[in-house]
Amino acid sequence: MGNLTFSNCKDAINLVWHKSKIGIHITRTDRDFNHIKFAEKYFFHTNKSNHNNYLTKNMILNQWCAVEAAIKWDHGKLAKDINHWQYFEKPKELIHKKKNIHLNYSQINFHNWTIALAYEEKTSFNPEIICCSKNF
């Protein structure tokens, strides 16, 4: 039968069907927030970085998006689980420290959005089909 999951933001929705369990999150790349404060509060808490001064908004959005996809994969709660997820850019891996969950993820940048998929498979997903209702 497969698994169906979805994510939405103010002007887009993503639906994903896959044979295995999968999580997805979408957010706008122009989202307005203080990315440094956000990163200090929610991310990099396990490996405090000396290079927080060059963290870009895009880097934080990608991390946020991947972690949200992992939380959705686990059917977790954002407020409860966000501090337990570790994000690794290379290899593209997400680890829940408390539950010892290891996931892989893929990032897709599409027009004004960044999209992340979280899954157990070892191979990365290729975005084979993206359907839009607008011409870009």
Where in this protein do the model-derived segments appear?
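Conserved nucleotide-ligand handling architecture
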Residues: 1-136
